[in-house]
Amino acid sequence: SWTMSRDAGEGFVFAGVNYYDGQGFLVRRSLNLASAAELNGARVCVQAGSNAQANADDFFRSRDVAYRPVVLATEEAARDAYGREDCDAFSADISALAAARTVLSNPQEHVILSDVVSKEPLGPAVKPGDDRWAAVVRWTLNAVILAEELGVTRENAEALAKESRDPRVRRLLGVEGDYGAMAGLPKTWAFDAIRATGNYGQIFDRNLGSQSPLDLARGLNAQWNARPGGLIYGLPIR
């Protein structure tokens, strides 16, 4: 997650946000809970030293709900403890909970509650002092996001490079201008990335969405101009 302590304190250089997540709670469906606020006295598995532990503390304390944290060294250990019923709930990023549910013995017996108790903007980070590499990562991320907005896909990128009259598409695909040179890349850097991986929506669907076992909705990770809109917004290439 892109936080102030990691950015300003630890010195990571974040190149953007590729997934807007939030912390939630995974519980057994048999508990018939409507909200995590009903977990009074419950054992909640969290990873030691993570944002998850602090966020869970804040959530329950602000609602005057007593809970019993079960603190494990790793997220995997917390998931396994939940699977063994050593705790009543498992709290982590919702994407991690969705992944954890797929490896439980009976995934359909577990539900992610609707509560979202934190903001977790996830994205690539690079070491400080390598501005050129940070620019490559940042603008490659923006290129695949912009490609989705402009209707450029893995399948049609080659045809659009030859046929499109839209100057935004032509700049993106390296037909007009030489924007890649600014980051030490070839003119076709964005075209090559899109051909290799697809646009942002295709990457999302394949790894997190309808084509993956997680089957997560786009939610906040929809394009800004979608209906309903999300927070994904590609910076202009010009």
What does each model-identified segment do?
Residues 1-38, 94-118, 233-236:
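Acidic, polar ligand-binding/catalytic clefts
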Residues 175-238:
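C-terminal functional modules
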Residues 29-33, 37, 42-43, 48-51, ...:
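Extended ligand-binding regions for polar small-molecule ligands
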Residues 20-77:
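Bilobed "Venus flytrap"/periplasmic-binding protein-like clamshell domains
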Residues 9-13, 37-38, 58, 75-91, ...:
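Short helices/loops that flank or line small-molecule/ion binding pockets
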Residues 53-54, 80, 98-99:
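Alpha-helical elements of the RecA-like P-loop NTPase motor core of helicases
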